[in-house]
Amino acid sequence: MKKDVTPMMRQYLSIKNKHKDAILFFRVGSFYEMFFDDALEGSKLLGLTLTKREDIPMCGVPCHTSKEYIKKLILLDRKVAICEQGGVQTDPKGPLEREVVEVISPGVVVDEDFLQDDVNNYLVAISDYKDYYSFSYIDLSTSRLGIILYEGSFLEKLRRDIEKYSPKEIIVSESFYYKYLEKLALDRFLVNKVPHWHLDKDIAIKSLKDHFNVLSLSAFGFKEDEPYYISSFLIIDYIKNNLKNLLINIDTIYINSDSEYMFLDDVTQINLELVKNNNDLTARYSLYSVLNDCKTPMGKRLLREYILNPLLDIAAINNRLDHVEFLNNNVNLSIKLREILSNVWDIERIISRLQMRKYAKKDFLFIRETLIAFFSVKRLLNEYSFNYWIFDVNDEGDIRGIYSLIDCAISNEQDELIKQGYNSEIDRLRELKNNASKYVDDYLDFERNFSKINSLKIKRINVRGLFFEVTKSYYGQVPSHFIESQTLNSVKRYKTNKLIELERDINDAEDNLLSLEQEIFDEIALKVVKYSTVIKKVAEFCAYIDVVSNFAYLAKKNEYVRPTLTNNKEIILECARHPVVEHYMKGVEAFTRNSVRIDGEKYFCLITGPNMAGKSTYLRQTALVVLMGHIGSFVPANKAIIGITDKIFCRIGASDNISKGESTFLVEMNETANILRNATQDSLIIMDEVGRGTSTNDGLAIACSIVEYILEDIKARSLFATHFHELSAINHDSFVNLSMKIERQGNELIFLREVEEKPSLNSYGIYVARIAGIPLKVIKRANIILKSLTSRENLCVSEFFTSATSVVNDGEDTMEEDLSYELDLNAYLELKNLISKIDINNITPFQAMNLLSEIILKTKM
């Protein structure tokens, strides 16, 4: 640092040194200035003009427009430290006092302009104290702090939860970060690394006890000698350090129980595109986008939570389904509810802002409007005897009290905080401010009548203020209480004690009014905050009614049916549809319905058939329908019986992971290993084209072994799509062959997208390649090679390429003949498969005649 640096710049550098990971907004007058590296980065990110003063790079933004610039930086995953200046200058030669009053970062924002109304904004902390691993999360805008305890193996659960909560920021120890950086891909996030010694059990206990004002952490379900709670301490400590003097509105810690919810690992969440698609990572084309027709921000966030946390308890699921069915059967009730709910505001986030003393008048008006809607919802539900209520008698009284307070106290007028009639002093000051000229005129009339000076006037000059003006002809009539203040050629100017007092009152009225209004406004806010618990109950109630009425609306609109949940090992779906594909195909093409039948005896389905025939859609739709049933939604099918499913594993498609040095095949094997290690007989396994990333023989061997392992060891309900047609020969009592139906019309194939119970012995890959636009020369050569492969299966590679060499003719006749060969090949393979299964030692003459008739029929097709 230069010795001749100014005192203010020394002050800046001292403050910046304490906030190295943030862009420092340094208040200078009416601007926030950035210097040095912050100026270089800020000018680039915010599009600001970069200047220099004494070779110091600098740029700045006006304080009154700073919010927009801060928002841009937050969206770019930057932290912003707000440094304000005080009015005190302790050293006459030094700068004004300055201090950082708040550090705004992506994980701790509460300003509604920085948030998406339908997405929670999570800050996460991961604790690795000794062998006690835990995952705490909070959306500060709703003030809900939760914790997940990991007992035993934790890495797969941690991957699941990082994907589920999609945090804006993560807090971890330095040692944990570098140990698991690649395994958890932590570089995707804004990560705050703390020294490992900061994870101190005793400090955490004291800090949490002090914050929650409790004698023991057992109040939250913790054992103090099992320090899982350290992750919650990390979150609270981080928020307090960032928000400085703001009140922290965290009043409890919720311990999540894994046993209550279906396990969906990170890969499954991604492959099923539950809340975001895999293309641009937005909600469009996700299950959430199809199921979200909620009317409130709270309902939208609750729907996301339901989708990512399907229930396992049949009673809890049926309770939701009962409410959905009731609303589905009472269409008028459902319509009226949704109309009322459209007037509900995000009071869950509003009350959190009130608790942190970051509020505006509109927040109180939104609470009032929401409570009006709440009363209407309650009255409507009572009329229809709808049996959902989470409030007690005291709650209802408190809710009415909150409404009355806001209705009586908060003004609807744009330039007023407090309503007329609530406070007499505010009324007086407002009257004085708004009618100052009338008060002056009234006093002038009084003095005119008293003095009989008809030409008496009251004038105002900025320097002298208000004064009476009397002309020469009336000097003799000037009352004794007039105090002469100035004599001019033709007039004299006077003041009175009353006029001085009136002027002072008028001048002070606006300032006093603003001050008193703010004081009363803050008192009202404190009164409302006392009832934050019951307001959060109202938010919870509105969110739930919103979600179940939304489910009922979608069920009626999309012809969904109520699923039956059982404790049996079964999935029986009649004429099921893929909810997302169907939704986005509307008006373009009718969706082909397919059925699924899996039970305790036949629980493994192998699905074969060509690409483009709909295998992946069939797999995904089965998983999505099962999941929808577990969240209490009606489902897209004519009939649905779903056995409780503890886990869904979905391995569909794969890509390489360059950052980890993992090939596509290795990624596929990692995902498969996770399934085989963690699936149970109550799980649903969805696997597509396992083994395709290596040699044919290796892939076939691996796929076959996986199928056998699932059949014999795991015994989970499974849908396994493959192009290894050899797998269809597996002989097992629980094994079922399914294929995608196709129809041949001349040399063309029609993909019917229907599932039938039989194997497909050909993938029609060359046909698909042709319609994809592969050059005809390549297609014809592929047909020649295919013929050789089919007729000489046992040749070694070198022999094969020698024998398969031939001149490729460009004529169309040859092309059609070659294409026809691939189509005929499937018929031949089906016929061969049928004949090979005939047991001539155990067949009656009648059965033999029927088989011969079937063979003759197939040869004519």
Curated annotation (Swiss-Prot):
Q: Which InterPro entries match?
A: DNA_mismatch_repair_MutS, DNA_mismatch_repair_MutS-lik_N, DNA_mismatch_repair_MutS/MSH, DNA_mismatch_repair_MutS_C, DNA_mismatch_repair_MutS_clamp, DNA_mismatch_repair_MutS_core, DNA_mismatch_repair_MutS_N, DNA_mismatch_repair_MutS_sf
Iron among keywords: no
Has keyword Nucleotide-binding? yes
Give the UniProt entry's GO cellular component terms. Answer: cytosol
Single GO molecular-function term? mismatched DNA binding
Q: Which residues lie in coiled coils?
A: none
Task: Give the matching PROSITE patterns.
Answer: DNA_MISMATCH_REPAIR_2
Q: Which Pfam families match?
A: MutS_I, MutS_II, MutS_III, MutS_IV, MutS_V
UniProtKB keywords: ATP-binding, DNA damage, DNA repair, DNA-binding, Nucleotide-binding
Provide the residue positions that the database annotates as binding ATP: G609, P610, N611, M612, A613, G614, K615, S616
For this chain's UniProt record, which GO biological process terms are given? mismatch repair
From the record, give the cysteines joined by S-S bonds.
none
Q: Which HAMAP family match?
A: MutS
Q: What does the function comment of this entry state?
A: This protein is involved in the repair of mismatches in DNA. It is possible that it carries out the mismatch recognition step. This protein has a weak ATPase activity.
Q: Which family does the record claim for this protein?
A: Belongs to the DNA mismatch repair MutS family.
Protein name stated in the entry: DNA mismatch repair protein MutS
- Originating organism: Borrelia hermsii (strain HS1 / DAH)
| Encoding gene (name) | mutS
